[in-house]
Amino acid sequence: DNNEPPTPTKKKRDNTSKTKLKNRKKEAKKKTVTVSTTDPDCGLFVKGDHKKQLAYEAHTVCDVHGVVLDVEVTPGNVHDSVPFDDLYDRIVEKFPQVHAFVADSAYKTPHICKKVFGDDRVLSTAYKRPMTMKGGHEWWKYVYDEFYDCIICPEYQVLNYSTTNRDGYREYKSDPKICANCPTRHLCTHSKDFIKTVTRHIWKDYEELADDARYTPIYQRMYKARKETIERVFADAKEQHGMRYTRYTGLAQVKNWVKLKFAAM
């Protein structure tokens, strides 16, 4: 049945070392942070190359009727996936009967996919373009062989498993002797030692379940309904309830203001 929800795969055995990793050495990294002199609590919201402003974000959950169920307000420089855990936990506690969540591509992360599918629920998201080398081989030309746990490159060479890094990504590396004479190496890697490294998250299988849901008819219809539900909530909030611009300063005041507005809507 095409409407059957994707099911989590069996947990694979990880043959990596079980020894505890040492704590990372904290390096003093200098970075430029834009801070408002009027409201230091807000953050710089960036959306592509066309939108950049100091703002707050209202991470909002609504039901199929467009009724706001919960909201989390953060500075504009906080990624959408950061407040997800708190929102998700509160929603499933209040409404345990919920079986599916629909969200945009910002929420398609390994952690979020594992959290939702691990609870026997379904996450339907938009397509998320893989981040690959500009002008290089397409991402889908690197094929993962689940049986042998290796990556096959566009030239049909094997990249064997090397290690699992601290961020939860399994690293697969090529043979530099083969890559040194590869005719398409310029499309693959600019590494001086001729080693191509491909990473795959240990929870990638859960991300693939989200892709499966994207092609399932029932979840396709649910995703298309976003424009009539959550997007309509944001549109009405901005156009009819004066929420296009922040009227207060300070995170606490803005949070109370947003919750009061959504309660009235």
Which stretches of residues belong to each language-model region?
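Anion-binding and metal-coordination hotspots
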Residues: 1-265
